[in-house]
């Protein structure tokens, strides 16, 4: 295995009972240590199935998965699960503690972590996600964004090498989504954790180092956000959205305004339009 590759999957196949086609159809991809990769695709493209396969939640028909040098098997599955932390769509389904502090500590108690070390990890985790002042609060009384930050703290406390976000921001309002993404950005900068984001949210995908596109259980393309977003119409054809600057660029092009062919972020779009205006 390439020492830079923390996740390597090859020729994965999986079919749900009574399904008309494979959910994963000869899927192969690799992810570097410390990389943030967004997996995008329409509903039914295989995104969540792929995520669940990585820590042995599914019994694959065929294929190989290697996590940090360990081939996934019955013998290694628990070692691999300790390397991976998952945050799901609905944080309420992950809460077990009566307070934020209890909930963040729960996974550590199951691992038999010594009490002093457990207290240190819990405090560090809630500090990192900006929830220190809510330590004694009931999770059910928090906002959506706050709940996901607590769920994230519970994962951080366990110190995994890989963080998987399985549609973790899809049920949040824009403010809550931004809170969670900013928290992950900060965490990534401080720890260099590998992040795998399963999403159909283009703004979330834009935060990644690389985007992998799935369709019908297969990887159909991958590249930087700028490379993928430049496809424009192809994303729409796959049932995905395109960033607002790309929509604006298409509309301006139809009006005859000269626009570059590559993807423009909001900042670059403003700079480009300002340059055009100054030349008028």
Curated annotation (Swiss-Prot):
SUPFAM superfamilies: P-loop containing nucleoside triphosphate hydrolases. PROSITE patterns: ABC_TRANSPORTER_1, ABC_TRANSPORTER_2, CBIO. Forms a stable energy-coupling factor (ECF) transporter complex composed of 2 membrane-embedded substrate-binding proteins (S component), 2 ATP-binding proteins (A component) and 2 transmembrane proteins (T component). Its EC number is 7.-.-.-. Coiled coil: none annotated. This is Energy-coupling factor transporter ATP-binding protein EcfA1. Its main location: membrane. It is an enzyme of class 7 (translocase). GO terms for molecular function: ATP binding; ATP hydrolysis activity; ATPase-coupled transmembrane transporter activity. CDD domains: ABC_cobalt_CbiO_domain1. InterPro entries: AAA+_ATPase, ABC_transporter-like_ATP-bd, ABC_transporter-like_CS, ABC_transpr_CbiO/EcfA_su, ECF_ABC_transporter_ATP-bd, EcfA_1, P-loop_NTPase. The lineage of its organism: Bacteria, Bacillati, Bacillota, Bacilli, Lactobacillales. ATP-binding (A) component of a common energy-coupling factor (ECF) ABC-transporter complex. Unlike classic ABC transporters this ECF transporter provides the energy necessary to transport a number of different substrates. NCBIfam families: ECF_ATPase_1, PRK13635.1, PRK13648.1. It is found in: Cell membrane. Residues 7-241 form the ABC transporter domain. GO terms for cellular component: ATP-binding cassette (ABC) transporter complex. Gene3D superfamilies: P-loop containing nucleotide triphosphate hydrolases. Keywords: ATP-binding, Cell membrane, Membrane, Nucleotide-binding, Translocase, Transport. Belongs to the ABC transporter superfamily. Energy-coupling factor EcfA family. ATP binds at residues 41-48. It is a peripheral membrane protein.
